[in-house]
Amino acid sequence: MKRILSIITSLFAVSFLLAQSNNSIATSSIKIEMLFPEGKTKALILSFDDGTFADRRLVKLMNDYGLKGTYHLNSNKLDTKGYLSKDEIKSLYKGHEVSVHTANHPALTALSKIDIIYEVVEDRKELERLTGNIVRGMAYPFGNNNDLVVDAIKGLGIEYARTVKDSYNFMIPEDFLRWDPSIHQFGKAYFIPNDSVNDKKELAGFYKLVIDFLKSDSPALLDVWGHSWENDGVGERWIEMENFFKMVSKRTDICSATQIALVDYINAYKNLKISVDKKIISNLSSMDVYIKIDNKAYKISAGSQLSIKKD
């Protein structure tokens, strides 16, 4: 009996190998790549924390250049000295994303699980009340996180959580609850007071990364984070911010988007249903998804199916 089973197994293996050599199966090696919304090859996230008065100037600057921003706010600090009023949140951030930064900006790694949950849920609830929108994103205060913190925010409706650990690359993070940005605004320029040598070095590094992003031939995501208040009181920093916006705003190959919009888009791409030979691709999501196969771009409309015709 064992010998018969061995023979059957061997025959099955041979049949499988022959099937693999068939042209219709061999096409499964087709490489499918994600493009960003509207078929763009690059995407830009601009992510700023805290919700201070300086956000007013930054939002206006973004609006002037047609850029989208993601703003992480501490709801219990609103209506206090130096921070925005609750009454202006909805109108000020119209067209941008408002996201969780916890209610009081504590170091979450120093809190118990129940206090972590409180900080996130209370902030989310109040920001939803102020904006009239569902809030699904977050930035960790001080960037502080660990396994306990990440475990605590799971199930709270948070779909991404940004750190402050610069990656210096253009890759999409694998873990959205440990989302490392590309770089801080201007690198670490201006971190050390009155150190023009360091400022020059860090600015050069920042602009080099931006230029590398602009020159990239592969799909690339540039995620720049910071605080609007870092620019306040120092004119040249606002000038630098505007120079950066000028560099990226008129590029037709860049998709400027809020972080949650890109998260939704990436998830829609990940949830595409693909046939074994990769010739049929179904998009069950409510948004259009763009892909590239053999250097050719395809649009898969929301709720539709794409059939690839290849020789």
Describe the residue ranges of each PLM region.
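Alpha-helix N-cap and loop-to-helix initiation/capping positions
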Residues: 111-118, 198-201, 236, 240
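Boundary/entry segment of secreted carbohydrate-active catalytic domains
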Residues: 21-56
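Active-site metal-binding loops of divalent metal-dependent hydrolases
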Residues: 48-51, 102, 228, 259
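Extracytoplasmic/secreted proteins, especially bacterial periplasmic and envelope-associated proteins
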Residues: 43, 57, 115-118, 122, ...
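A Trp-anchored, charged/polar loop motif used as the substrate-binding/catalytic surface
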Residues: 195-215
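Bacterial Sec-dependent N-terminal signal peptides
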Residues: 1-21
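Metal-dependent polysaccharide deacetylase catalytic core of the NodB/CE4 family, i.e.
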Residues: 63-159, 164-193, 220-228
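C-terminal domain-boundary segment and adjacent tail
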Residues: 24-36, 64, 79, 128, ...
